[in-house]
Regions:
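Binding/recognition "hotspot" determinant
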Residues: 2-341
Length: 341
């Protein structure tokens, strides 16, 4: 592929050849990734009320009237960006530009790679990103009244939230050569989490540039999911009934004595992970600014096998919240039953 007057620009492109791929531009060469974006925002709410009549049978037999109401609301947010790298695959790859050559979310893979760049050789790895937020809240209350029995009032509250985010390099950008090695010449080389690497011996790798700069990329992921719940109730008024002998009795129920709370311990699922995508150059015959040097003297990472360390993927946050709610509901029921007993 030759451009005699302008640039060569490949985006989200896969080029495969059995023998050789050649890019020759009079100006610049840009190989970059495409992006897949996902965005979702949602809200939900519910409210309800009910009034009814019932009959109780037992020590406090009678007709009662009850009223209950509930309200809940929630929201969810998701935003993600995924990079789809441009890739070149062949036995030999030749890249030549009079101006700059930039690999921004791109990989060139071949047994031998030759690059002759009149300007800057920029190799930049791209991070995929993911941000999630889930929130849910609910409250409820019930009041029951009847003649001859104490009034009952109860309520509950629950709140859950989860947040997760990650940014990580999935596929490192770079020139990846085999036993034929890399043979790179440029005015300036800049690596941002990028790689110039090969599986060849030092003698088969050559890098010549007037200047070199490099930096690593930090990857991270973290999430936190929390659920809290509280329920309680009280009774008050005059309570009439019959004891085991059939005798009538009357009790005055004091709300201070009959009030109960059933809080559950907050549940939390929390984790984080981090890693580094290293700017990397495999050991070779390296000359920077007219002086021979080594990767050790440059202080740059040289092991391509450990150059791009992945972080843990985010878990299903909604599944975590659902599990926490099941545990919270069960715990609240046990606590309430224990206190009643």
């Amino acid at each position: 592929l030759t451009s005699t007057e302008g640039d060569i620009h490949l985006k989200n492109t896969q080029v495969n050849a059995k023998d050789k791929i050649s890019l020759d531009a009079a100006k610049d060469i840009l190989l970059e990734s495409g992006q897949s974006k996902e965005y979702a925002d949602g809200k939900n709410s519910n409210a309800g009320a009910q009034v009814g009549v019932g009959v109780s049978v037992g020590a406090q037999t009678g007709v009662y009237v009850y009223a209950e109401a509930g309200y809940g609301k929630g929201s969810n947010h998701l935003e993600s960006t995924t990079h789809n790298n441009t890739t070149l695959n062949a036995d030999k790859i030749s890249i030549k530009s009079q101006g700059d050559t930039t690999l921004k979310g791109a990989q060139a893979k071949a047994n031998r790679i030759d690059a002759d760049v009149g300007g800057n050789l920029n190799i930049i790895s791209q991070q995929d990103t993911l941000d999630q937020n889930n929130k849910q809240m609910g409250v409820g209350a019930r009041v029951q009244v009847s003649a001859g029995t104490a009034w009952d009032a109860s309520g509950n509250f629950n709140n859950s939230s989860a947040k997760g985010n990650s940014k990580s390099v999935n596929e490192q950008s770079g020139l990846f050569a085999g036993e034929g090695g890399y043979h790179v010449k440029a005015d300036h080389v800049d690596l941002k989490g990028g790689a110039i690497a090969s599986t060849a011996s030092k003698e088969n790798n050559n890098l010549t540039a007037n200047s070199l700069t490099f930096s690593n990329i930090e990857n991270e992921s973290s999430h936190k999911a929390t659920t809290v719940a509280l329920s309680g109730g009280t009774r008050f008024g005059e309570e009439k009934g019959k004891d085991s002998t059939g005798a009538q009795y009357t009790n005055n129920v004091n709300w201070r004595d009959s009030t109960t709370f059933s809080p559950t311990l907050p549940q939390q699922d929390k984790d984080s992970d981090s890693s580094t995508t290293y700017a990397t150059i495999s050991e070779g015959n390296i000359s920077i600014g007219g002086k021979d040097t080594t990767v050790e003297n440059l202080g740059i990472h040289s092991d391509i096998n450990t150059a791009n360390q992945k972080v843990d993927a985010l878990p299903d946050l909604q599944a975590i919240l659902d599990k926490q709610k099941i545990v919270s509901d069960a715990t609240s029921t046990v606590v309430a039953a224990t206190r009643t007993y």
